[in-house]
Structure formats: C-alpha cells, structure tokens
A protein has these predicted regions:
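Conserved beta-strand -> loop -> alpha-helix junction used to position metal-binding or nucleic-acid-contacting
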Residues: 1-2, 6-48
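Acidic/histidine-rich catalytic cores and adjacent linkers
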Residues: 2-6, 12, 46-156
C-alpha cells in the first residue's frame, strides 16, 4: 500500500518500483471474473491478460493505448447509473470501473513497466512478476511458520 511507497522513498529515494504484472492482472480478474458477460468486461479482461505478454516499450505503448481506447469506446456504458437497495445512486458497472482504474493508476504511477527500463537491467532481463520471491523466499517462510504454528514469538 501507501506505507511501502513512503518507506521506499525514505530509505531509497531513487529506487524504482515494479508492480507485479500478474497481481495487476489478478486485480482485474477479481473485478471482471474469469468469464465476464459484457463486451466491455471481456475486452477489459483481455487487456489485463495481455499485460502478461509485454516484452518491450513499444508493446507497452500499444497496451496503454488499448486501455485508453477501451475507456473511450465504453464511455456511455460505463456512465450508466443504478439505484442500490438503500436508494443511493451508484455506477451500474462499478467493478468494471474499479478494474480500469486499478490499471490506469499503475500506468500513471509508472510502476507497471519498470521491468522494461533498460537502464536498470545491466544486461539482464528484469522480471515483470515477483514469482521468484513468492515461490522461493516467501514460500519457505510460509512453510516454516506453518510448521511452527503456535510457537511463542519469544522462542522464535
């Protein structure tokens, strides 16, 4: 969240942040489901899924253009309103709007395509996901904690 971003700026002011593209995709999938029913939902899901295939800045630029064009194309659909059970007027396609906003925010913050910045790579390709840490270090920590469930912290 915001706490991490503040801490990163304080400790490493010049560090660049990369949002895991897989987790960005999952955020959209949570909002649209894996089988969206509307055309706008299907297209948003595909845009998010295609995020996982981007290999260079040119592809990233095309992807951002698709995201912007999606918003323009579905503007009328996305502006539809409904009244909830408490009588409050809300966007009818709230979850779809949330999905789009999550991606647009990452684009604005420049945290979606940091892995494509050649000045950071030192000849080695940077990962677009955090699979290495999730499957490596974090998995070992989770296993250790699971095996020692109930162990008092003072003994750890």
């Amino acid at each position: 969240g915001h706490g991490f971003r503040k801490a990163l700026k304080r400790v490493w002011p010049k560090a660049k942040l990369q949002r895991c593209t897989f987790h960005a995709f999952l955020q959209v999938k949570r909002c649209t489901t894996g089988r969206p029913k509307t055309i706008a939902g299907i297209e948003m899901y595909m845009i998010a899924k295609d995020l996982l295939m981007i290999k260079d800045m040119e592809q990233a630029g095309h992807w951002v253009t698709r995201l912007i064009n999606w918003r323009i194309k579905h503007k009328t659909f996305l502006s539809e309103m409904t009244r909830d059970e408490k009588g409050k007027i809300r966007p009818m396609h709230e979850r779809l709007l949330k999905a789009e906003r999550s991606l647009a925010r990452l684009v604005r913050q420049n945290t979606l395509f940091t892995y494509l910045d050649e000045s950071l790579s030192y000849g080695e390709e940077l990962p677009s996901t955090n699979n290495r840490i999730e499957g490596g270090i974090n998995a070992q920590l989770r296993t250790m904690l699971r095996n020692h469930r109930g162990m008092p912290l003072k003994d750890a």
